[in-house]
């Protein structure tokens, strides 16, 4: 289904003009050239239409207070595993590097270590910053490589430095919320057997003055993971699983984390979702967070990561790109001819229902399906006459839901009768 701008939605022109810069203008032209004017206009609406619930004020009201953070610092857990944060760093602006390290130092959970691999041997500013923090905090350790080995091998060198029971992945220019590790260890108290965890995230501007695009994720969903790397940040996994999975693989550079997450979840027992925004993905000119087209090769690597996962798990499926970068479709072969049940809740909608049924019949090549219409307190004679007309169609079944409208309950009711 194609996206459409919301009817009557108005672009906040003042907000848009405030954000104009040579970079954002170039980015806009790139997007329009790649996707065309229609998709560009849709994206413009998505980005600058007024939000029903503006995220910025919600975020500021949502973050824990200093009093809450101080209470967390005093919390003693029965299970307090060492969490190692692995960071491959390459030509990191020193301001970003400091902010990343500081986001660990202010964590309300204290049993952590930060393992940074510096692949910029000639960057003296980075060397000074890393030496400064390492000297001032024993939990901050770093290793200088003689040369840049690439993102996969740099990360593996960081993995090799870790001593913790769990390992978390943090990009060199991103930030953790101060309660990130606390919330992870808190959920581990009730699920000490969990092998992997992931959190919600948002994006933040280069200057850290605006949070936007929150990504509130579902619990672990393998089918969704096969369509896009929805887990992404912040991902924490037992080191034993890292060792079993084998670390990052350079042949998947650009989507090395996607491939890694697949292999970790394949080897993990319980995978937990921590429903808190605990990771802040910084956007800037070279960041895929703000400019997906800056790493086009990454999306082909993502496709190969899914294909490799399907092969390892013995799952037959054909993987293809979609028009949205980083999103994929897996087309599975149909096994036999299973019955498909189509559920349609309805109240008094004769014309809409008739159109729906006609389109199903016209556009569906697969014929082994049934249609379950759930009648919900209709009052017009017209709809009941139409139900009577449909009674001769053996594919159509009519159920009655006499309670008040509840979309989820109605569909669950129909599914039980499918």
Where are these regions (language model features)?
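Catalytic donor-sugar/metal-binding loop of nucleotide-sugar-dependent glycosyltransferases
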Residues: 250-252, 262-281, 286, 304-322
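A recurrent flexible, glycine/aromatic-enriched loop bordering the glycosyltransferase active site
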Residues: 152, 160, 204, 210-240, ...
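Acidic donor-binding segment of Leloir-type glycosyltransferases
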Residues: 105-147, 361-400
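Donor nucleotide-sugar recognition loop
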Residues: 246-262, 297
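Glycine-rich, basic loop-to-helix element that forms the pyrophosphate-binding segment
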Residues: 145-162, 183, 401-418
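N-proximal low-complexity "stem/linker" segments adjacent to membrane-targeting elements
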Residues: 33-105, 307-362
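Short aromatic/hydrophobic "clamp" motif used to bind/position activated sugar donors
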Residues: 167
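Conserved donor NDP-sugar-binding/catalytic core segment of glycosyltransferases
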Residues: 175, 179-212, 284
């Amino acid at each position: 289904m194609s996206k459409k701008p919301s009817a009557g939605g108005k672009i906040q022109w003042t907000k848009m003009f405030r954000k104009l810069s040579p970079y954002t203008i170039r980015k806009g032209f790139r997007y329009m050239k790649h996707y065309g004017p229609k998709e560009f206009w849709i994206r413009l609406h998505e980005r600058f239409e007024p939000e029903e619930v503006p995220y910025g004020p919600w975020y500021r009201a949502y973050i824990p207070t200093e009093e809450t953070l101080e209470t967390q610092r005093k919390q003693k857990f029965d299970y307090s595993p060492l969490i190692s944060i692995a960071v491959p760093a390459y030509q990191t602006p020193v301001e970003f590097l400091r902010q990343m390290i500081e986001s660990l130092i202010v964590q309300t959970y204290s049993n952590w270590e930060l393992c940074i691999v510096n692949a910029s041997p000639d960057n003296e500013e980075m060397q000074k910053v890393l030496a400064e923090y390492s000297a001032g905090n024993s939990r901050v350790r770093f290793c200088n490589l003689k040369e840049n080995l690439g993102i996969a091998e740099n990360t593996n060198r960081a993995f090799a430095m870790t001593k913790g029971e769990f390992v978390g992945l943090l990009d060199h220019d991103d930030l953790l919320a101060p309660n990130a590790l606390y919330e992870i260890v808190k959920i581990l108290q009730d699920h000490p057997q969990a092998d992997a965890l992931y959190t919600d995230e948002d994006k933040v501007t280069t200057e850290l003055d605006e949070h936007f695009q929150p990504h509130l994720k579902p619990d672990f969903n393998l089918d969704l993971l096969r369509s896009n790397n929805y887990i992404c940040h912040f991902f924490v996994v037992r080191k034993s699983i890292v060792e079993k999975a084998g670390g990052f693989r350079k042949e998947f550079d650009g989507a090395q984390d996607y491939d890694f997450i697949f292999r970790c979840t394949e080897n993990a027992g319980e995978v937990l979702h921590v429903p808190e925004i605990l990771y802040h993905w910084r956007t800037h000119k070279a960041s895929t967070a703000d400019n997906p087209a800056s790493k086009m090769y990454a999306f082909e690597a993502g496709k190969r990561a899914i294909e490799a996962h399907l092969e390892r798990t013995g799952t037959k499926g054909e993987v293809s790109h979609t028009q949205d970068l980083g999103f994929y479709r897996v087309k599975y072969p149909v096994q036999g001819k299973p019955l498909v049940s189509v559920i349609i809740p309805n109240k008094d909608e004769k014309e809409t229902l008739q159109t729906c049924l006609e389109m199903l019949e016209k556009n569906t090549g697969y014929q082994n399906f049934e249609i379950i219409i759930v009648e919900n307190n209709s009052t017009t004679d017209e709809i009941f006459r139409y139900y009577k007309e449909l009674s001769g169609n053996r594919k159509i079944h009519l159920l009655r839901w006499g309670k008040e409208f509840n979309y989820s309950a109605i569909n669950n009711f129909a599914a039980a009768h499918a």
